[in-house]
Every structure is written in C-alpha cells, then in structure tokens.
Design a protein with these regions (language model features):
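C-terminal alpha-helical "lid" subdomain
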Residues: 2-6, 11, 20, 53, ...
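Mid-core helix/loop region of P-loop NTP-binding domains shared across ATPases and GTPases
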Residues: 2-5, 28, 92-96, 107-155, ...
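Pre-Walker A adenine-sensing motif
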Residues: 28-40
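Walker A/P-loop nucleotide-binding motif
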Residues: 40-62
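The feature captures the helix immediately C-terminal to the Walker
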Residues: 61-65, 242
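Post-Walker A helix-loop "phosphate-sensing" segment adjacent to the P-loop in P-loop NTPases
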Residues: 65-76, 106
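A short hydrophobic beta-strand->loop->alpha-helix junction that borders the nucleotide-binding pocket
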Residues: 78-91
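The catalytic "switch" region of P-loop NTPases
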Residues: 142-144, 152-225
Length: 288
C-alpha cells in the first residue's frame, strides 16, 4: 500500500518528473560520453531528430538537469557545464544572442549590434566553463531564407569552435537536410534518429515501464490487443503515449480499480481531436 493519499499520488502522476525509458537512456548515454571527452578545439556533437512529440525536448531537459549550474563561493564563480536554449522562431542571430544572455541571467538592455551581443555572450560562456551547448527546436531555422539558414548554422559552428564545446541540436525530421547543408557542421554532428513507436517488443517495454512508474497497487496485465490499441490511438508519438497512460492511471486510482485494464484502454477517449494532429511519415531508411 502507498503511504501517499490518492490525491497525492494523482498529483505526482500529473507532475513533470522524469520517467526513464530505453530510447531516452541511449541518447543520454551518448550525450554523457560527449561531456566526458577531453576538451579539444573541434569537439564532436550530435543532432537528435524525429517527429514532433517524440521526446526530444524531454531528453534535452533531462540532460541539462544532470549537470546543473554550480556556484563556487570561494572563487566567486558560477560554472554551467551545459546550456540549453531554444532556437528563435526564425534564424535571427541578434535574438539568439539575446536569448542566451537572458537565459544565463546577463541580459543586455537597449540597442546593441550583433557583434556586441556576441562578444558579451562569449565572454560569459567562457567564464562559465561551458562544455555543451544544446539548441532545441533547431527546425525553426527553416522559417528563414536559405541565406539566413546558412548564416545561423555558421554562427552555431563558430560558437562551438570558440568555446571548445560540443554542439547538440534537437529538431524535427525536416531540419535534417538544412543542417546537412552546412558541410563543416554536418561533419561534426553525428545523427541520432528517434522513430515513431511500432508494434514490437520495444513498445511493449515502454508501456511496462510507464505503468510501473504510475505505482498502482494492482498489476496491470494488458493484452497484446490493448498494446496495439494504445499504439493506434497515440500514433506512436511518445508524448501522447505518456498522456494516455497517465490518464488511465489516474482513472484507475479515482475509481479504486488500482490497475489499468483492457476495458479501460478500449474505452479511453483521447484528449486531442482527430483533426488536430497529423503524424508525419517516417523518413527514408537512409536517415535511420
């Protein structure tokens, strides 16, 4: 029996806490390996790509949380091993530098040239002993012209070179070719593809992992048919799988069932409407 009340258990399920699963662990291990590499002038990096909702941002936030900012009172210095920032809505260098400065708590007010923002950002990042720069939503660069995309990617490469830091970018499938368009950057970034979930053992393990994390008091022995229903309803998108399992677990607690049943899976109604989401096709096998 749980020591928490039903309300406390439900609040915990609804909370934004990390639930480890195999695919995410593989990416995190790759990122950890980059962090543990000796610093050099041209650090290797990684591009993690896949459909929207597949878990990229979740993984990025988890990685950043493993290397939190630390303040050394004796030295009066702040060390930030990893900086996670979101790409601006369009490939805009000024906005990107402003966002970096705001994220690290050093905003520059008033009008400044891109060069001034760049110098200030680099100065702070060097002082923070940055080892990895992670850019989420890198596909936002597609909102710009070809020339703007090239300039933005060149800026990212310059930052990584100047700081001797690993560059890690996260984006949807469509961003892959844009990043590959910068030959020098593409050679530095290994690629890790996160596909949609399929009807296989890996998906079964994911569901088992998620249900176990819900800490229900009874065992949920779902049939293969139920697993396929979950896959069909969610379209194989990680975020929707999480939403569905969490919703079913909350229902199980509220009703006193304390387990997710086949009947509950079949009866579950998605919180998204059928016309509100489109699952893109998997990229060609060559991208895997």
């Amino acid at each position: 029996m749980s020591l928490m009340t039903p309300e406390e258990r439900i609040d915990r399920i609804r909370g934004d806490h990390w639930i480890a699963f195999d695919r995410a662990t593989i990416v995190l291990n790759r990122l950890t390996s980059l962090m543990e590499m000796p610093q050099q002038s041209r650090m290797p990096g990684l591009m993690v790509y896949g459909s929207s909702g597949i878990g990229k941002t979740m993984i990025a936030k988890r990685m950043a949380s493993k290397y939190p900012t630390q303040y050394n009172a004796e030295l009066g210095a702040t060390k930030t091993p990893i900086l996670l920032v979101q790409a601006p809505p369009a490939p805009d260098e000024r906005r990107f530098y402003q966002h970096i400065l705001a994220t690290i708590g050093a905003p520059m007010w008033g009008r400044h040239t891109v060069s001034e923002l760049e110098v200030r950002a680099l100065s702070h990042l060097r002082d923070m002993d940055l080892r990895m720069l992670m850019i989420d939503e890198v596909h936002n660069l597609l909102a710009g012209s070809y020339r703007e995309q090239r300039r933005f990617l060149n800026m990212l490469r310059f930052l990584a070179n100047d700081l001797c830091a690993s560059l890690v970018v996260f984006g949807v499938n469509e961003a892959l070719e844009a990043v590959r368009g910068d030959d020098q950057l593409a050679r530095r970034l290994d690629e890790h593809y996160l596909p949609l979930w399929e009807d296989d053992v890996e998906f079964s393990r994911l569901i088992q992992t998620l249900i176990a994390a819900m800490a229900l008091e009874q065992r949920s022995g779902l049939t293969v048919a139920s697993l396929r229903t979950i896959l069909k309803v969610t379209g194989g998108v990680t975020s929707r799988v999480f939403i569905m399992i969490k919703s079913l677990a909350i229902d199980a607690i509220e009703t006193g069932e304390e387990r997710i049943t086949d009947e509950a899976v079949q009866a579950w109604q998605p919180v998204w409407t059928k016309h509100a989401w489109n699952i893109p096709r998997q990229p060609a096998a060559a991208f895997g």
